[in-house]
Amino acid sequence: MIGFLNGGSHGYAPYLTGFREGLKNEGYIEGQNVTLAYRWAEGQYDRLPDMAADLASRRVAVIVANTPAARAAQSATQTIPIVFVTGGDPIALGFIASLNRPGGNLTGVASLVDETGPKRVELVHELLPAISAIALLLNPTSPAAESTSRTVQEAAHTLGQSVHILKASTDAEINTAFARLSELRVGALLVVNDPLFNTRPEQLVALASRHAIPTIYPWREHVVAGGLMSYGTSITHLYRLVGSYVGRILKGEKPADLPVQQSTRVELVINLKTAKTLGLTFPITLLGRADEVIE
């Protein structure tokens, strides 16, 4: 049995599609020769320690966990293999000793998507060079919240922009954060990488549309749902790598000996239909660098 521990919402397809593909590539198919025990925190990260403890008590063969969930799993067991996926630095987060030789019972995939915040600021500036203030939506309970906030603010200040921090760790707080946008008079919104936001693309896109705020997201899935643009790695690709590592561990390999995989592939996705609705025109230079343009 595999434990799948996640801070986001139940059954978010891009997570599971890639993960199942990775498992299948190693010869494992859910419901045939492997079972999964899913635990979704629905953005309530304070539930993760109990969920992790429950999976550990069930003696699952391996635990799959994203950043906040991996921290809970790490506290729950020092023996069950844990395969993480994180947008941050796994060494700085305390998950591993080194990238090549993780050492303990954790290994996984690092996308470094948290480090792309400054690039998102630059992309917004390229699209909207006249704006003087932007908003940053983050989850204050995230381990990466402080570092992400700092790097985004530094990048914005370099471009002469101020940054208003909007905090949300529940659905209600997401709605409240968007409601504040009009009073803040910001020209654009940046949504950070976080399981709470990653598993709610439709909700975030609908709110951005309602408030007519140009928004840049960390994942392609938000743009497919109608968001303006995204810059980041592929969730499906990351979880495919995770699934492959889980399969290898089930075959007997040790997480301590499996180097952390770093996904450096990033993609810029633009939605021209949404841009037209907002009355925006993307510069040719920006369109030319896009990996995908949705019309």
Feature annotation, model-predicted:
Residues 1-295:
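Short hydrophobic alpha-helices and adjacent helix-cap/hinge residues
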